[in-house]
């Protein structure tokens, strides 16, 4: 009789979970100060950011995009989100799913039709967690 077993992966540590949560908090803080350089600093050198109609690759491109966005469409805004799911892909990879969105001036909650779901793909490089890819999409299909 042959038995097949699923590969086992050691459970992630609390410090890994905290480090990944810290990535999201660094993004929120960078957004609060409209600091495009700090925003881009959470990404790997070749990290990607996909927003509706937008694709940016690399820290420099992400920083340039966010610099313009903070002076344009995102001027005066904040961003918020809450985790929905966190899964580890071995010891050095994780996927975080969040629900959130952009808060316009005066808003304390994301408008229902503006809410997004986001996927954060994190990788551990030399013992430190980085954002390799970020993508968001509207929570509801717009008619």
Q: What is each model feature region?
A:
Residues 106-109, 141-143:
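A short, polar/proline- and glycine-enriched secondary-structure boundary/capping micro-motif
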Residues 86-94, 122-128:
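A short, structured loop/turn motif at beta-sheet edges
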Residues 16-23, 36-92, 99, 111-113:
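A solvent-exposed, acidic/Ser-Thr-rich amphipathic alpha-helical stretch
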Residues 2, 115-143:
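Short beta-strand edge/turn micro-motifs at domain boundaries
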Residues 97-104:
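Generic short beta-strand segments
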Residues 46, 104, 138-140:
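Feature marks short, surface-exposed loop/turn motifs that line or immediately flank catalytic pockets
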Residues 1-45, 143:
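Short, low-complexity N-terminal intrinsically disordered segments enriched in polar/charged residues
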């Amino acid at each position: 009789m042959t038995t097949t077993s699923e590969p086992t992966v050691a459970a992630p540590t609390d410090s890994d979970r905290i480090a990944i949560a810290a990535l999201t908090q660094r993004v929120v803080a960078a957004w609060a100060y409209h600091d495009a350089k700090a925003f881009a600093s959470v990404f790997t050198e070749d990290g990607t950011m996909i927003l509706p109609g937008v694709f940016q690759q690399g820290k420099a491109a992400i920083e340039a995009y966010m610099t313009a966005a903070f002076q344009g469409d995102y001027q005066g805004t904040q961003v918020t989100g809450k985790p929905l799911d966190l899964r580890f892909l071995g010891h050095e990879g994780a996927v975080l799913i969040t629900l959130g969105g952009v808060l316009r001036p005066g808003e304390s909650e994301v408008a229902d039709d503006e809410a997004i779901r986001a996927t954060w793909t994190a990788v551990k490089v030399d013992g430190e967690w980085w954002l390799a890819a970020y993508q968001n999409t509207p929570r509801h299909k717009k008619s």
